[in-house]
Swiss-Prot record:
Location within or outside the cell: Cytoplasm
Main location: cytoplasm
The enzyme's E.C. designation: 2.1.1.166
Keywords from the UniProt entry: Cytoplasm, Methyltransferase, rRNA processing, S-adenosyl-L-methionine, Transferase
InterPro entries the UniProt entry points to: RNA_methyltr_RlmE, RNA_MeTrfase_FtsJ_dom, rRNA-MeTfrase_E, SAM-dependent_MTases_sf
Annotated family: Belongs to the class I-like SAM-binding methyltransferase superfamily. RNA methyltransferase RlmE family.
Species of provenance: Methanococcus maripaludis (strain C7 / ATCC BAA-1331)
Gene that this sequence comes from: rlmE
The protein's name in its UniProt record: Ribosomal RNA large subunit methyltransferase E
Enzyme class: transferase
One GO molecular-function entry: rRNA (uridine-2'-O-)-methyltransferase activity
Catalytic reaction equation(s): uridine(2552) in 23S rRNA + S-adenosyl-L-methionine = 2'-O-methyluridine(2552) in 23S rRNA + S-adenosyl-L-homocysteine + H(+)
Amino acid sequence: MGKKDKRWVLQRKNDHYYNLAKKRNYRSRATYKLFQLNEKFNLIKERNVVVDLGCAPGGWLQAARDIVGEKGFIVGIDLQTVKPLPYENVIAIKGDMTKEEILKQAKDLLPEKPDVIICDASPNISGVWDVDHARSLELTTMALMTATKMLKKGGNFVVKVFQGDLFEKYVQLVSEYFDKAFTTKPRASRDESAEVYVIGKRFNGRKFDINSKSPIVKLLDTNPEEKEITSPSLRKEISKEDSGLMIKRIKEMRSKKE
């Protein structure tokens, strides 16, 4: 075992939330992030209908189930197969949340439009700041777009974002679709992590504007004829050319801002 591996193992052994999650049979330490976010912002209530985007390995599904109880309902979507949870009101679908057929499958399972959309998904981390920031923005904008398609009016939204040059622009974009937008970092997030959570409270019912002048929307790959959005990061495949293009866009926006 190398030094990095030993350091990682030691870090996990000393990680309060990792040990707590293991003790209480939660699949991820991230479970406690959702508990803390909900405690602060009152996003999810008992009996709510919830959709979890990028739900693997299932930690947020477990947290949401603990909050909504047996009379709520939760559907998760992820590219990976998620091991079933022992609850009749929690279902995980394998698929791409940007695909209409997957969204239809989720909608068909739901008893009504969701009260809350949650997303703790992360793109593949390259270690290159601009690339990771761009991938994160692409993924979180996909989540926002999906939320505007599914949420009931007045519903809530929470998504993980990596900090960077365009972080505030993303928060501004969220505020266009919700009455209030907040940012926070729960106690369970590691101090060294660049992750921040963006909260949208009370969906105003607006449809996502793919022609928006927002610099965040311009980062997306679009089909100009059909206006369909593709998500290389969501498929966990992104070429060097795609990465370079996103970095170029971010640098151009950065220079304009300066």
